[in-house]
């Protein structure tokens, strides 16, 4: 539930890792 960081930030651009199931949360990409 968004507790595992994906090692990507989403301050300026969306999460590229969203293709792998990650989502932006608090300017950092987390895996759902």
Swiss-Prot record:
PROSITE patterns assigned: CYCLOTIDE (PS51052), CYCLOTIDE_BRACELET (PS60008)
Tissue expression as described in the entry: Expressed in leaves, flowers, peduncles and seeds (at protein level).
Cross-link (Cyclopeptide (Gly-Asp)): 1-32
Keywords of this entry: Disulfide bond, Knottin, Plant defense
Membrane-spanning intervals of the chain: none
UniProt PTM comment: This is a cyclic peptide.
S-S bonds: 6-22, 10-24, 15-29
Source taxon at top rank: Eukaryota
SUPFAM superfamilies, alphabetized: Cyclotides
Domain statement: The presence of a 'disulfide through disulfide knot' structurally defines this protein as a knottin.
Family to which the UniProt record says this protein belongs: Belongs to the cyclotide family. Bracelet subfamily.
Annotated function: Probably participates in a plant defense mechanism. Reduces growth of and increases mortality in larvae of D.saccharalis. Kills cultured SF-9 cells of S.frugiperda probably by disrupting plasma membranes. Has hemolytic activity against human erythrocytes. Has no antibacterial activity against E.coli strain ATCC 8739 and S.aureus strain ATCC 25923.
Name assigned to this protein: Parigidin-br1
